[in-house]
Amino acid sequence: MSQLCPCGSALEYSSCCQRYLSGAELAPGPSQLMRSRYSAFVMKDADYLIKTWHPSCQAQTFRAELEKGFSQTEWLGLTLFASDERRVPNEGFASFVARFNDNNRPGAIIERSRFLKENGQWYYIDGTRPLIGRNDPCPCGSGKKFKKCCGQ
């Protein structure tokens, strides 16, 4: 059996994000780009990450820092819980929780990422991180309090 895609889609990697990371296809929308970028972090593919950051971010300038993070971070899972791709042409959003261990310490990134489409390609531009109280419902949709879920 083939390897499942790290993005959490429950599809085989060869039928999911591999086509984007290999350059065979461009991600068709923000949610697919979000998933493929998460897979690139898992696969330690700095080239793909840099290629999919918006050119204004000058991602090439922090390649060394990115690659250093690969050796310290183990990615544990992605939950994409909201996507808004059609309100403004050429701009889209994807909200997610990405769980990880960094130097054996658990953590989570909770973000609403913003993507821009230029010349037919979607790029990650930036993101905002919500302020979540420990007793607030977890934004991943589990129904648990944040402190008992992604906030651990």
From Swiss-Prot:
Transmembrane segments: none
Coiled-coil zones: none
Gene3D superfamilies: 3.10.450.50
Domain of life assignment: Bacteria
Family (UniProt): Belongs to the UPF0225 family.
Protein name listed in UniProt: UPF0225 protein KPK_2103
Organism the protein comes from: Klebsiella pneumoniae (strain 342)
